[in-house]
């Protein structure tokens, strides 16, 4: 029986020869992930089970990234709970401040997430790891606690939607962020509800791994159970530099069944900006012309990778941030930060008048390191622009890729990069 890549991964981890959409299964996990917001809740639930130890200390990852460094007593207590549990349990994949990064940038970089894995995380953007050819999805803290205790999780097999991006003739500065914003704009924030979004085509093959990670990161913004990109030579080259354990590559059968198939030519996709207050409000950047902004954020689990830093620096080199704009740049991990320093990118940001932060999720969730006041407007490379997402309920958040964000920081309004180059 023909199956999609998602169905094949779940079938094997459930010990089954085949599965069909709608079927309930129990699957073996390769990784259970939590952060400093969700982890303490999972730990409390775990301790209620009466279980002494996690099922496998090499398959649990605890990442204190949302409030790093701690912003107040409450966040310090959350980090302390994670730290003490990691030490007590001997958790291998725990990163302390100074080594930690934004979880969905850090784990692929460190070779913790690999093709063919089944991964659950108490964070909705766990779907990022689908870019490696893994089944990865967000769960609640209670399900995560059960996963830490048993090494298993239950799933309903999702239907799959196939997205084919034809051609490689990208418009200037268009990236994976623009492809995924365009996609969400076409199908809506519930257009893939509890479905697997499978991204294929020449356009996807042409993307870097950083661009692919960005795309899968935002699958959940269309309501998807997971996003996934079948591995190719580019994937394997990336993984083989990092992997410390065996992995298995899966691909969809040619005659696998999809509930919907979308097909677009990348040449027809311009730079995108998602207007408030939903990611589905994606429009060409030209429609944002004249919209003034108070703050720009370049970073996050969506666009905090090295390629994003490089793109932003290309535009900011020799430029100055507009006098009415605050520009905050946040490399996703310490390694990305270090590489950006070695390439001279950090100097470019600072010379332009940007704040460069240690890796943190901070402003994305309205936590700290860039909160918006009443009436303020931000352009951000993050993944959500809900009401009050980055601060005051009467603030506004627009979403874009790093090229548009950097250009807009210079002009003081939403702008195409060509306006400053």
Swiss-Prot record:
Coiled coil: none
Alphabetical UniProt keywords: 4Fe-4S, Amino-acid biosynthesis, Branched-chain amino acid biosynthesis, Iron, Iron-sulfur, Leucine biosynthesis, Lyase, Metal-binding
Gene Ontology terms, MF aspect: 3-isopropylmalate dehydratase activity; 4 iron, 4 sulfur cluster binding; metal ion binding
Enzyme Commission number(s) of this protein: 4.2.1.33
Catalytic activity: (2R,3S)-3-isopropylmalate = (2S)-2-isopropylmalate
Keyword Iron: yes
Membership in a protein family: Belongs to the aconitase/IPM isomerase family. LeuC type 2 subfamily.
Listed name of the protein: 3-isopropylmalate dehydratase large subunit
Gene from which this protein is expressed: leuC
